[in-house]
Amino acid sequence: MNRKLLLVTLMVTMLVMQPAEAGVWDWIKKTAGKIWNSEPVKALKSQALNAAKNFVAEKIGATPSEAGQMPFDEFMDILYES
C-alpha cells in the first residue's frame, strides 16, 4: 500500500509542479534574452570580438582583414606552428 500511495503522491506532485516549473523557465528565458540584447552587453560583445580579432591577427602576424581572407587550413597551420 505504501508504494502505491507514494506513486500517487509523486504523480500528483509532478502534475502540480510542471506548469509552475514551466513558468519559471519561461521567465528565466525571457529575462536572459532581454539581458543578452541590452546595450551594455552588446558593447561588451563587440569589445570581446575586437579583442579576439586583434589577438589572432597579432598571433599570425597579419592585419584582421588579411586574417579574414586566409584559407582556413593555412590559418590553422599558422596558429598550430606558433
From Swiss-Prot:
Pfam families: Antimicrobial_7. Its main location: secreted. Forms an alpha-helical structure in membrane-mimicking environment. Antimicrobial peptide with moderate activity against Gram-positive bacteria and Gram-negative bacteria, as well as low activity against fungi. Acts by inducing bacterial membrane disruption. Shows activity against B.subtilis (MIC=4 ug/ml), S.epidermidis (MIC=64 ug/ml), S.aureus (MIC=32 ug/ml), E.coli (MIC=128 ug/ml), K.pneumoniae (MIC=64 ug/ml), P.aeruginosa (MIC=64 ug/ml), and C.albicans (MIC=128 ug/ml). Does not show hemolysis activity. The keyword rRNA processing does not apply. Residues 66-82 form a propeptide. This is Antimicrobial peptide Smp43.
